[in-house]
Amino acid sequence: MKNKNRHLVKNVIGTLTIPVLVAVLLQGICMFNGKTMISNMTGFDNFVVYIAIVMITTIALSINLNSGRFDFSLGSMAALSSVLGAKITYSILGGGSNSALMMLILTILFGMLLGLVSGLMYVVLHLPPIITSLGVTLIYEGILFTITEGRYVMKEVQNPSMTAFTGSWIYAAIIIVVVLAVCIAIFDYTKFGYDYNCLLYTSPSPRDAHES
C-alpha cells in the first residue's frame, strides 16, 4: 500500500512539474515587461479553455505514442469535425438557442466517425501508421478546404449562442473532468483497456501486462 501511494505521489509530482515551471517562467517574462499572465476574468476563461484544448489533444495523441505509433491526422480530424458540426448546426438552428449543445454533440459524433474511418484504413490497408495518418490528413484537409472554400468558417457561424459555451471557464473545466473520467474508465476498467495494456507493455503474459 505504501509503495502504491508513493508511486501515486511520484506520478502527481511528475505530472505537475512541467506545467508549474512553464507557468512560473511565463509569469516571470510577463512581470519583467510590466504585465501579468492573467489580468482579468476573461483572461482566466481563455486560459482554462485552451488548457482543455491542449490537454484533450495531448491525451488523444499519447494513446498512439505510448504504443510506438504517431498519428498526424488528429488535427485534421478535429478541424473537419468542428467545421461540420458548426455548419450543420447553423444551417438547422441559425444560431438560435441550444446551438452550442447541438454543435458539441455533432462535433463529437463526427470526430468518432472520422476516427473510425482512419482506424479502419490502417487495419484494412496494412500500411505503416505514419503513411496511413499522412494520407488521412491530406484527405480530411482536402474535404475541409472544399467545404469552407478556404475561408474562415467562424465568420459565417459565429454568434452569441454558439460561442457562449467557450465564454466561461466552467464549461471547459467540466469537459476536462469528464474527459479524464472517461479515459480512466476506458483504459483501466474495460476489456479495451486490458487489451491496450497488453499491446503497450508487450509482456509475455496478458495478466502481467494488465497488472503492470
Spans of features found by a protein language model:
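Interfacial loop-to-helix junctions that mark the boundaries of transmembrane helices
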Residues: 6-11, 39-47, 162-172
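Transmembrane alpha-helical segments of polytopic membrane transport and secretion proteins
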Residues: 1-18, 25, 36
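Transmembrane helix-bundle core of multi-pass membrane transporters
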Residues: 4, 125, 129-190
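Hydrophobic alpha-helical transmembrane segments
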Residues: 13-17, 47, 76, 101-109, ...
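Structural signal for alpha-helical transmembrane segments and their membrane-water exit/capping regions
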Residues: 21-39, 67, 144-148, 183-193
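Alpha-helical transmembrane segments within multi-pass membrane transporters and channels
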Residues: 94-137
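Single transmembrane alpha-helix segments in multi-pass membrane proteins
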Residues: 23-31, 40-93, 120-126
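Conserved small/polar residues in nucleotide/adenosyl-binding loops
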Residues: 201-206
